[in-house]
Amino acid sequence: MFFKRLYELRIDNDLTQQQVADYLMCNRQVYGRYENGIREIPVSMLIKLADYYNVTLDYLVERE
């Protein structure tokens, strides 16, 4: 599942959930639910995250 990729990217970049949530302008608990696969992440936030981590959307959602 791609939510694992969100976690890996965050850890690889030495970021906290709060830092990513601040960038997305959302609550840390909400971001945590995205990262844990509890809540579906909106496409607009996926685009922001792809830009933030400088990766493609395909990479982010593990589409090969």
Go through each PLM region and give its residues:
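Alpha-helical residues within the helix-turn-helix
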Residues: I11, D22, D51
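A short, Lys/Arg-rich alpha-helix, primarily the initiator
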Residues: M1-D12
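DNA major-groove recognition helix of helix-turn-helix
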Residues: E35, Y53, E64
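Short alpha-helical DNA-recognition segment
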Residues: L15-R33
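DNA major-groove recognition helix of helix-turn-helix/homeodomain DNA-binding modules
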Residues: S44-Y59
